[in-house]
Amino acid sequence: MAALLLAAAPALADESPVPGALQQFGLLGTWAIDCARAAGPGDEYSIYAVSPSGEATLTYTRGEAFRDIVYAIRTAEPVDNDRLELQVLHLPERIQVNLVLRKEGDSVRVWSSHTPDGRMLVIDGVITGNGKDSPRFKRCGGSFSAQD
């Protein structure tokens, strides 16, 4: 399924700015804290995908025992070569969250995140709720950059 979504992405990149920005940043596909382990509470996976109709989503999965967390990606704008700003809607509630992803070597992580009312969830890569670094995700089964 992911291969089909990735195959459709180049055609969609010219039609919609969101799929194009995700592809340019090298984000489309499956990422995990540890790709060698199955998704679970200690090894979350993030999946960036574009449907054939051009709808972009971000799905966090922690295994069968947990419900996936799905976001519709509404906007994707490059901040610089290493950062991409996303506006996402948590589904099905449609709660808006703004976030900035940051590339660090061969990984990507949430660098900042906030709600429209200004509530900060992640600041400079640190989760405000627990003071821990946001997890670093590595690409599963492929190169980091769309240009590689």
Model-flagged regions — what are they?
Residues S46-V50, V97-K103:
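Broad, structure-driven detector of short, well-ordered beta-strand segments within folded domains
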Residues A8-P10:
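N-terminal signal peptide c-region/cleavage motif recognized by signal peptidases
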Residues R37-N81, D133-S134, R139, F144:
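N-terminal glycine/threonine-rich, aromatic-flanked beta-hairpin/loop signature
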